[in-house]
């Protein structure tokens, strides 16, 4: 099963228990490290198209009992990164930050062979300035960030989630941990804030009652998402959760903590303190939306998707799904 192969690029898992989730994050922290090296000293090697090199490394990994790690890499990126004389397999989620560090982009990169792609990376890194901050997790390189704290600030996942839990214990007693999802790119957890439902949603419930709608339909919640590989900041999303089906209704923009400008846990703690006020603000906006009449929901949804420049095919699929949800 994929869930047992933490090293695999497509590894993912879910948790319904907060203690198990935290223990899992502790294991991931123990199996990861951050290292700094001059960007121009980094050298990539392609395994694809080089049978002799592939066989040599497979023998090495077999002797270390980690042949599956290399086999998974060959099925995905087929890249090794040499850092200070040691070769590390490269995970798929690292490609985004690698390209950003090398300052290259373009669809053509997906069409060239791995050998050509590797040469391009090495040429670009050879003229790069400054240091790179590299995360190695579960035997593979997961990210290559800029080495200056202004470029990338490390905010470890474990203390972030622990801080959110402590904050909810203190400020939102009576909450429930619903679920958490982990993969090598991004981690998300969701809590249901039952204990504060009346306080946060009193006006909202009153407006629902005035319109003849059930006040038990939704409860407040929090979704927290973070990433160590450049996919997301440490972002707090106030949400509503439908009571019957558990669907999530986003409430405006998240409270974002970007991994830049020397951001630290103290800064994130300050962001947590904004959560109650953000709930109030977004609920007020939600109430105002109740006065907006939508006569043609299908066309309205298509218009919204066009506004955000969603692909046409995906837009029609989303609009059809939306139509089925509202039972028109």
Question: Model-derived features: where do they sit?
Answer:
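Feature for intrinsically disordered/low-complexity regulatory segments and propeptides
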Residues: 2-163, 171
